[in-house]
From Swiss-Prot:
Disrupted-gene phenotype: No visible phenotype under normal growth conditions, but mutant plants are susceptible to the pathogen Leptosphaeria maculans.
Species lineage: Eukaryota, Viridiplantae, Streptophyta, Embryophyta, Tracheophyta
TIR domain location: 12-176
Role according to the record: TIR-NB-LRR receptor-like protein that confers resistance to the pathogen Leptosphaeria maculans (blackleg disease).
Name of the coding gene: RLM1B
One MF term in the entry's GO annotations: ATP binding
Active site: 87
Protein name in the entry: Disease resistance protein RML1B
Keywords in alphabetical order: ATP-binding, Hydrolase, Leucine-rich repeat, NAD, Nucleotide-binding, Plant defense, Repeat
Enzyme class: hydrolase
Domain of life: Eukaryota
Native organism: Arabidopsis thaliana (Mouse-ear cress)
InterPro entries (alphabetical): AAA+_ATPase, Apaf_helical, Disease_R_plants, Leu-rich_rpt_3, LRR_dom_sf, NB-ARC, P-loop_NTPase, TIR_dom
Entry remark concerning the domains of this protein: The TIR domain mediates NAD(+) hydrolase (NADase) activity. Self-association of TIR domains is required for NADase activity.
Length: 1017
């Protein structure tokens, strides 16, 4: 096993040096500490062979310098030894010069006695100093004062010495392992991954635990596992990283022989004994059952591998940890591994940082490469492997070379990336491979039930296939709040699927994707055959083509037809004959920019499940009634010439009807009343739509989008089961009765001036922004499920009534007439924004600020930190010196002003850092997204609450900054809170707890200057 010191950035010989007075602690506390440290693999300097003298010798000074941590055990007689005091001075010198970590244990003495050299400790100190010079006395006194201010363990406060010693050992291990090995320094997001996995590992638990790291190929599982190994291996007696297990299967062995072979390789590595030979499968248990081990099993893809190397937890000693990385979640279920960390894709911000770290060796784009970097990040789909490979290939390249790479990435998959991703695909059986390819080409981001219906008449086991693909991390089944499940495949996996099709022999292909090959077939009506089930091609990459009437005659089994345009240049490159014969078995017809005014009269939609004619030239689909029993989804969006919908009486299974941007559509036909399974209706942007049939009861209809239907004045009751109603930018004046409504959005509907007398109590989200509403009804407080309200730009709204306690978000920006709000605003953990509300009266401002004390956030105009914040400072930095009373949280107030040079439209972020005096750890950094600072007309107050996990009595420095420099920080302030008083005040519904604190001085907290007719701060 590698010693803990071997992983440090400096070569330390010992983990710990202990400074102590032998007669006080050697046979008691110190002996117990040594025993615990030995159990945990912590090496501590042993001073028993050193001869004590009047001064500490070179060997002891060297031992102090060669130790990563010094533990000072301050006992009653510690100061009676000049040796101990000289040790202490040397230790503090090493702390200052070398960054040595110093920990303290107060063993039977009060820290204040040590600090002031009083009591029995002071008597011993004075006796020692009586024989010394004043210079030595001052030197020792200063050292004792410094060490007493280092937070440590106070023996008198512990009821159980053993538990205290266990905690000390854990603290030592945490400090030894405070950061990963330098191999992973600067790796974006690695700390967050390690923090989550360490939580699952529960390292203080003596049970043996198996934890998995799961995710798709290229997500970074192995990298995370290696960083974890570097971070934790020194905590264990034995450790081993077993890599590339995927390639460990040898066909020359039977199952027993394979497991035996794998165990031999494993034990040879973990025990550092090359060429081990074993004769039975109990060898791991025989060798490791009494050892605390850390084992990483990387890239596991067979259950046999787990059965061979970690079949039972009893094979390993107490406290052992086994970490498995895999793409196969089903394998984890089969082996009974329930503790799994699922590696997710990085955020947009982190993905850009990852790319830049490889392309520029920094975390942000070089000047002039900002847009190109964002384009590459998007094309890589935020997959860390893709960002790494592509970023490295771009290092040192010029802008025009970057542009070439961006163009190539749109259609071509890098070979190194393909090699990694293809492994998972090739491990699938034929059924799963077929389904994978169909999803990659036709059904990415489609509804799961819809896809199952697509294959209802085939032999393909879609339900089982989807489960396999999800378990292998090749797709993700994304579940939405309304219960819908969509199939999501990563963009690079899609490209890999296309490459897999291109590598097939022409006569083997069930799916055609080569645009030139397909156009040749359609133009000359020859080639292909019975086995072709799908066709998908990009018409933006071809010249003009005229399709023959019998083009699909040789493809009788064609079920999936997709014609799309990756670049919409407005040109119609395809010419379709009026009487073209579509395949009669079509289940998917997805044709973007269809060039004809209608579908051919011979078109038979009997088997059709989805009809998608986005941006078509259609004026109508067909005449008369058609058999539509299988149709579940119809999308005619952006068909600007569409004047009428067909008779939909037979579409009794239709669930989704999308008509966005159908600008010529005037009326929804009455046949829609037969669509009893319709769940969603979307007519956004139908600017000429005037009529929606009345007297309908579409019992399945839950979501209705009517935004931008500027001529629509009346909305009938379409269903009493509507949950989500969006009627933005319309001419409507009222809302139909929907007793189960959850979301109501009438933003931008200027004719809408009043709410229903009784809003449904089921409402969770309400958007009234940019309406002429003047009053909100008193029933508002009874909406106990309401979570979010948007009143932005309601310029006539003068007051806010009592709000429900369930409210989490209230946006009232630019409410120019708003003066009063109901007091108090007792809403726990709520975020309130009153940007540019310059008419707020004194009581309203007081209520808004007070609300933030309930673990909330607030934004409102202001030039100075209000007097209620008892710690205030000019500029961006604030130091707080706790008064000794326990606190659990702070409320911060920051005065910001928009940087006039900023022209960004992306909401900037406020970064704040907590730095504790003499703390060896890293500062705590927290990002707070602060909204549209670029819209603030003057200075504003940003108020937010933050909890601390533990009380600390040392000085704390808080620093606030804007990484993007989009705003300036004028002032900052903070108020220390005790959790009990906040909780009691919230539960009582009063503001009594703040009466003494929230005393606003108008001359200080509120300015008297005028901004036009508005009082500003």
């Amino acid at each position: 096993m590698a010693s803990p010191s071997s992983f440090s950035s400096q070569n330390y010989k010992f983990n710990v040096f202990a400074s102590f007075h032998g007669p006080d602690v050697r046979k008691t506390l110190l002996s117990h500490i040594r025993l615990q440290f030995n159990r945990n693999g912590i090496t501590m300097f042993d001073d028993q062979k050193i001869v004590r003298s009047a001064t500490i010798g070179p060997s002891l000074v060297e031992a102090i310098k060669e130790s990563r941590i010094s533990i000072v055990i301050l006992s009653k007689k510690y100061a009676s030894s000049s040796w101990c005091l000289d040790e202490l001075v040397e230790i503090l010198e090493c702390k200052k010069a070398m960054g040595q970590i110093v920990m303290t244990i107060f063993y039977g003495v009060d820290p204040s006695d040590v600090r002031k050299q009083i009591g029995k400790f002071g008597i011993a100190f004075n006796e020692t100093c009586a024989r010394k010079t004043e210079e030595e006395r001052q030197k020792w006194s200063k050292a004792l004062n410094q060490v007493s201010n280092i937070a440590g363990e106070d023996f008198l406060r512990w009821d159980n010495e053993a538990i205290m010693i266990e905690k000390i050992a854990r603290d030592v291990l945490d400090k030894l392992n405070a950061t990963p090995s330098r191999d992973f320094d600067g790796m974006v997001g690695i700390e967050a991954h390690l923090r989550e996995i360490k939580s699952l590992l529960d390292l203080d638990n003596v049970e043996v635990k198996i934890v998995a790291i799961a995710g798709p190929a290229g997500i970074g599982k192995t990298t995370i596992a290696r960083a974890l190994y570097g971070l934790l291996s020194k905590r264990f007696q034995l450790s081993c990283f077993v890599d590339n297990l995927r390639g460990s299967y040898h066909s020359g062995f039977d199952e027993y022989g394979f497991k035996l072979h794998l165990q031999e390789q494993f034990l040879s590595k973990v025990l550092n004994q090359s060429g081990m030979r074993i004769c039975h499968l109990g060898a791991i248990k025989e060798n490791l059952s009494d050892q605390r081990v850390l084992i990483i099993l990387d890239d596991v893809n067979k259950l046999k591998q787990l059965e061979a190397l970690a079949n039972e937890t009893t094979w390993f000693g107490p406290g052992s940890r086994i970490v498995v990385t895999t793409e196969n979640k089903e394998l984890l279920q089969q082996h009974g591994i329930n503790n799994t960390y699922h590696v997710g894709f990085p955020s947009d911000e982190d993905a850009l940082k990852i790319l830049c770290s490889y392309a520029f060796k920094q975390t942000s784009p070089r000047h002039g490469f900002e847009e190109l970097s964002e384009s590459v990040t998007k094309l890589c789909g935020k997959l860390p492997l893709g960002l790494c490979v592509v970023g490295s290939s771009l290092r040192g390249k010029k802008e025009d070379e970057w542009e070439d790479v961006v163009t190539r990435l749109e259609t071509i998959l890098d070979q190194d990336i393909e090699d990694v991703l293809r492994v998972g695909y090739e491990s699938l059986d034929e059924n799963a491979q077929t389904l994978f390819l169909h999803i990659a080409i036709f059904f990415n981001k489609e509804d799961g039930d819809l896809v199952k219906t697509m294959f209802a008449e085939s032999d393909l086991d879609v339900k089982y296939g989807l489960k396999i693909l999800e378990n292998r991390s090749l797709i993700k089944m994304k579940i939405f709040s309304n219960g819908d499940t969509k199939i999501v495949m990563h963009r690079l996996l899609q490209q890999m699927g296309k490459r897999a099709i291109q590598k097939q022999e022409p006569w083997e292909r069930q799916i055609l994707i080569d645009a030139r090959e397909i156009c040749h077939v359609l133009e000359h009506a020859k080639g292909t055959g019975w086995n072709v089930h799908g066709m998908s091609f990009d018409i933006s990459r071809i010249s003009e083509v005229s399709i023959r009437k019998k083009a699909f005659k040789r493809m009788p089994n064609l079920q999936f037809l997709k014609v799309y345009k990756s670049k919409d240049d407005g040109n119609n490159r395809m010419h379709v004959p009026e009487e073209m014969d579509f395949p009669c078995l079509l289940r998917l017809l997805d044709w973007k920019a269809y060039p004809s005014k209608s579908l051919p009269p011979t078109f038979n939609p009997e088997h059709l499940v989805e009809l998608n004619m986005h941006s078509s030239q259609l004026e109508y689909l067909w005449q008369g009634t058609q058999p539509l029993k299988n149709l579940k989804k119809m999308d005619l969006s952006q068909s600007k010439n569409l004047k009428q919908l067909p008779d939909l009486s037979n579409a009794t299974n239709l669930e989704y009807l999308y008509l966005m941007g159908c600008e010529s559509l005037i009326e929804i036909p009455s046949s829609i009343s037969h669509l009893h399974k319709l769940e969603m209706l979307a007519t956004v942007g139908c600017i000429n739509l005037e009529v929606i049939p009345a007297h309908m009861n579409l019992e399945s209809l839950q979501t209705v989008y009517l935004g931008g239907c500027s001529r629509l004045r009346n909305i009938p009751v379409m269903s009493t089961n509507i949950r989500y109603l969006f009627i933005t930018n319309t001419a409507v004046e009222g809302v139909p009765l929907c007793p189960g409504l959850k979301t109501l959005d009438v933003s931008g509907s200027r004719n809408f001036k009043g709410l229903l007398t009784h809003l449904p109590t089921s409402l969770t989200t309400l958007n009234l922004c940019y309406t002429d509403i003047e009053r909100i009804p008193d029933c508002f407080k009874s909406l106990h499920q309401l979570k979010g309200v948007n009143l932005r730009g309601c310029r006539r709204l003068a007051s806010l009534p009592e709000l429900p306690r369930s409210l989490l978000t209230l946006v009232a920006d630019d409410c120019e007439s708003l003066e009063t709000v109901f007091c108090p605003l007792n809403t726990l953990k709520a975020s309130f924004s009153f940007a540019n509300c310059f008419k707020l009266d004194r009581e309203a401002r007081r209520a808004i600020i007070q609300q933030s004390f309930f673990m909330g956030k607030a934004v409102l105009p202001g030039r100075e930190v209000p007097a209620v914040f008892d710690h205030r400072a000019k500029g961006y930095s604030l130091t707080i010196r706790p008064d000794g009373n326990p606190y659990t949280s702070f409320v911060f107030c920051v005065v910001v002003s928009r940087n006039q040079k900023s022209d960004k439209t992306i909401p900037p972020s406020l970064l704040w850092r907590r730095i504790i005096a003499q703390d060896e750890g890293y500062p705590v950094e927290v990002w707070n997204r602060i909204g549209d600072v670029f819209k603030y007309r003057t200075e504003h107050l940003l108020i937010f609450h933050f909890d601390f996990l533990e009380f600390d009595n040392r000085d704390i420095v808080f620093e606030f900054s804007s990484e993007s420099h989009d705003f300036d920080i004028i002032e900052c302030g903070a108020k220390v809170l005790a959790e009990k008083s906040i909780k009691e005040s919230y539960e009582s519904g009063s503001d009594q707890a703040f009466e003494d604190d929230v005393v606003f001085e108008p001359s200080k907290a509120f300015g008297d200057e005028k901004y036009g007719d508005c009082c500003i701060l």
